[in-house]
């Protein structure tokens, strides 16, 4: 009996230790294999504009581990972390070591895979006496991201290293404040795409600090809510900065998002307006994290978005996006860039685990009258863990047709020999 008691105590201690060291485990992945009718691997083509189904050539994954490390008298501290990786899936072993080969007469080296630290932060709740319901945070994190899943298009996302307070109860809604760093680490000249190193005094990049304030959860009518936010991009150049960096202007971005809950889904309508460098976000499907500091003084832009998912009877669901964005005076006076996109994804559910998915996308980039047009048609058979539009994991067998009509009559596919192409493959996607 004594031996049994010792074993029981050991088992109990082991279980208790396991509970003490348990962590929250979340993640995302997509991976698969595909080929292109022109030869070679499948490609990714303007997926933010024409849709992502059957249009992703990468392997991408996120592993998120978090743990509540303190909980006492209503006060909690939580440590969160995330690692991400991406590759083209070309080999069994994909790491950071460079693979070198001949590219014509030159040796070209590329990394098989890239790894990144996407999140590492501390979140404290109940520690602010004036707002015990709010969360105080600092570190690197995904910050209240807004995206359209069917095109992988993030339209409001200032994620990065920073600090803030979120979820302060204020009237009918909740207030959040954040300060996030979004440096420009590429070269630019004012009014052009490349040139001088922006700021030698800051490691070659221009320091951009984004100040963000949001008021969310404002009830407007039955099942309808409003979120509004303001982002201020502060360009913080040093004395060693280039003239272009010193001439760069701070910018403001305003966002309003109306969410309407429906009996069988939801719909979101978004309006955004920005000045100076934020004008480029609306012309080029940006999210506010990349600030176009080289934009011409006085540039501005705006964007309208409508997207959502709705059930159509017992067997059909439909996801869609409509985007219209404008950037004005970005490079020269009276210059206008218009970006337009329409994507629909109807899903027919055969049973709880089997679907047929269609996706069609069409987009136009109008550069002062010079139009580039893009299109995509995809059909896929999918097996998923449930019948919902959002059910994952999901394995898909797909075929896609891609087309491009350029203003300069150049060809996009088959190494510049064709204006359309076809590809097929298999992809798995999961989140947990």
UniProtKB/Swiss-Prot annotation:
User: What GO MF terms are annotated?
Assistant: maltodextrin transmembrane transporter activity; maltose transporting porin activity
**Residues the record marks as site: Important in sugar transport:** 154
Task: Report the InterPro entries cross-referenced here.
Answer: G_neg_Bact_CarbUptk_Porin, Maltoporin, Porin_LamB, Porin_LamB_sf
User: What is the protein's name according to its record?
Assistant: Maltoporin
As given in the record, the signal peptide range reads: 1-22
- Superkingdom of this protein's organism: Bacteria
Gene3D superfamilies the UniProt entry points to? Porin, LamB type
GO cellular component terms listed in the entry, alphabetical order: cell outer membrane; pore complex
Q: What functional role does this protein have?
A: Involved in the transport of maltose and maltodextrins.
| UniProt induction comment | By maltose.
Instruction: State where it is primarily located.
Output: membrane
Query: Subunit structure, briefly?
Result: Homotrimer formed of three 18-stranded antiparallel beta-barrels, containing three independent channels.
The UniProt family comment states: Belongs to the porin LamB (TC 1.B.3) family.
User: Which Pfam families did the record assign?
Assistant: LamB
Look up and give the membrane topology term: Multi-pass membrane protein
Q: Name one GO biological process term.
A: monoatomic ion transport
Q: Where in the cell is it found?
A: Cell outer membrane
Q: Where is this site: Greasy slide, important in sugar transport?
A: 28, 60, 93, 266, 390, 431
**Its catalytic activity?**
beta-maltose(in) = beta-maltose(out)
UniProt entry keywords in alphabetical sequence:
Cell outer membrane, Ion transport, Membrane, Porin, Signal, Sugar transport, Transmembrane, Transmembrane beta strand, Transport
């Amino acid at each position: 009996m004594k031996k049994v008691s010792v074993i029981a105590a050991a088992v109990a201690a082991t279980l208790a230790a396991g509970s003490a060291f348990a962590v929250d485990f979340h993640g995302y992945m997509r991976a698969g294999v595909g080929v292109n009718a022109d030869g070679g691997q499948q490609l990714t083509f303007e997926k933010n504009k024409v849709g992502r189904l059957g249009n992703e050539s990468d392997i991408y994954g996120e592993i998120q581990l978090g743990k509540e490390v303190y909980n006492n008298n209503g006060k909690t501290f939580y440590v969160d972390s995330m690692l991400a990786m991406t590759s083209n899936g070309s080999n069994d072993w994909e790491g950071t070591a460079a693979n070198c080969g001949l590219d014509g007469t030159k040796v070209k080296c590329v990394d098989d895979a890239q790894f990144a630290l996407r999140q590492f932060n501390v979140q404290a709740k109940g520690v602010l006496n004036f707002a015990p319901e709010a969360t105080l945070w600092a570190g690197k994190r995904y910050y209240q991201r807004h995206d359209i899943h069917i095109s992988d298009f993030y339209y409001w996302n200032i994620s990065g290293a920073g600090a803030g307070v979120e979820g302060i109860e204020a009237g009918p809604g909740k207030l959040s404040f954040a300060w996030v760093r979004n440096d420009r680490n590429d070269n630019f000249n004012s009014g052009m795409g490349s040139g001088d190193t922006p700021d030698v005094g800051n490691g070659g990049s221009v320091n951009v600090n984004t100040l963000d304030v949001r008021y969310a959860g404002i009830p407007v009518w039955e099942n309808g809510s409003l979120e509004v936010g303001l982002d201020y991009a502060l360009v913080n150049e040093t004395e060693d900065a280039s003239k272009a960096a010193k001439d760069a202007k701070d910018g403001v971005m305003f966002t309003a998002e109306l969410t309407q809950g429906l009996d069988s889904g939801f719909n979101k309508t978004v309006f955004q307006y920005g000045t100076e460098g934020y004008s480029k976000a609306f012309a080029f499907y940006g999210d506010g994290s990349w600030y176009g500091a080289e934009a011409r003084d006085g540039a501005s832009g705006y964007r309208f978005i409508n997207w959502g998912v709705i059930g159509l009877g017992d067997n059909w669901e439909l996801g869609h996006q409509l985007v219209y964005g404008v950037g004005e005076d970005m490079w020269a006076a009276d210059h206008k860039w218009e970006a337009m996109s329409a994507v629909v994804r109807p899903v027919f559910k055969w049973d709880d685990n089997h679907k047929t998915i269609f996706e069609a996308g069409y987009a136009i980039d109008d550069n002062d009258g010079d139009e580039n047009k893009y299109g995509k048609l995809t059909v896929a058979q999918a097996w998923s863990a449930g019948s919902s539009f959002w059910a994952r994991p999901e394995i898909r067998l797909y075929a896609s047709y891609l087309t491009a009509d350029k203003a300069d009559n150049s060809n996009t596919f088959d190494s510049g020999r064709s204006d359309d192409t076809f590809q097929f493959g298999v992809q798995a996607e999961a989140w947990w």
